[in-house]
């Protein structure tokens, strides 16, 4: 896959999580693994390269920026840095596991009609996975994000909103981009704009990224601040997940 796919990881203050993800790519993909690019905007003492130097040496490119450029800016820089037609994204507290079947996921994506294909995300202590397909609709100043899908083709559910573990065409991500002003409340904004632009999205229901959640130490997300900014941007009053 190294000639056509780049696995992009944005990380801050979770070096051991990032190390687990990098090792899992090697373990489950072997020599047929994608290129691995990591962008780290953490404080110097919590950098991936400082805390986990062995795993940092395993990546193909490590980009270290000034402190806290934000999730959105980090993802945009990774997309700009990658040279392959296809990129994979997942949060740094996920890993590739037996049910991820990353190589099969990429092949399935490349043979589909989609621009972005996500997987499910599963925390070990929860009975059901996250990331099931959702739709996006706006009415009366409210953005609704209910569970649902447009159609099912094989194990792929075509929809409008998915989780943060996905494979996509790089030029599509370059065209939509994540809003850097929204930092950590970027997700629904990205997929709302993607829907308006006609991006074709789906979930491969037979593929799962294990999710080992860890809160980053010494980092405040300030998510309510960015949620208010996102609502103002779209002229909305609230978001309902139903």
Please give the residue ranges for each predicted region:
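Conserved donor NDP-sugar-binding/catalytic core segment of glycosyltransferases
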Residues: 100-136
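Short aromatic/hydrophobic "clamp" motif used to bind/position activated sugar donors
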Residues: 87
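A recurrent flexible, glycine/aromatic-enriched loop bordering the glycosyltransferase active site
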Residues: 147-168
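Acidic donor-binding loop at a coil-to-helix junction in glycosyltransferase catalytic cores
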Residues: 184-190
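Acidic donor-binding segment of Leloir-type glycosyltransferases
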Residues: 25-64
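Short, well-formed alpha-helical segments that are part of the catalytic scaffolds
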Residues: 14-28
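Active-site donor/metal-binding and catalytic loop motifs
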Residues: 204-222
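Glycine-rich, basic loop-to-helix element that forms the pyrophosphate-binding segment
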Residues: 66-82
């Amino acid at each position: 896959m190294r000639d056509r796919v780049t696995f992009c990881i944005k990380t801050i203050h979770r070096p051991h999580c990032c190390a687990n993800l990098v090792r899992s790519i090697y373990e489950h993909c072997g020599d047929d693994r994608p290129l691995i690019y990591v962008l780290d905007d953490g404080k110097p003492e919590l950098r991936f390269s400082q805390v986990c130097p062995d795993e940092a040496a395993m990546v193909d490119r490590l980009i270290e920026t000034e402190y806290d450029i934000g999730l959105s800016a980090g993802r945009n820089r990774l997309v700009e840095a990658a040279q392959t037609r296809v990129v994979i994204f997942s949060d740094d507290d996920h890993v590739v596991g037996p049910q991820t079947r990353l190589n099969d996921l990429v092949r399935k994506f490349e043979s589909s009609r989609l621009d972005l294909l996500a997987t499910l995300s599963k925390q070990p202590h929860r009975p059901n996975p996250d990331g099931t397909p959702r739709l996006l609709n706006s009415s009366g100043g409210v953005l609704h994000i209910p569970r649902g899908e447009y159609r099912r083709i094989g194990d792929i559910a075509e929809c409008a909103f998915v989780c943060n573990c996905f494979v996509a065409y790089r030029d599509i991500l370059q065209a939509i981009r994540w809003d850097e002003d929204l930092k950590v409340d970027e997700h629904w904004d990205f997929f709302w704009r993607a829907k308006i632009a006609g991006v074709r999205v789906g979930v491969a229901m037979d593929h799962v990224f294990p999710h080992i959640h860890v809160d980053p130490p010494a980092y405040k997300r300030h998510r309510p601040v960015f949620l208010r900014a996102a609502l103002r941007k779209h002229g909305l009053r609230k978001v309902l997940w139903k």
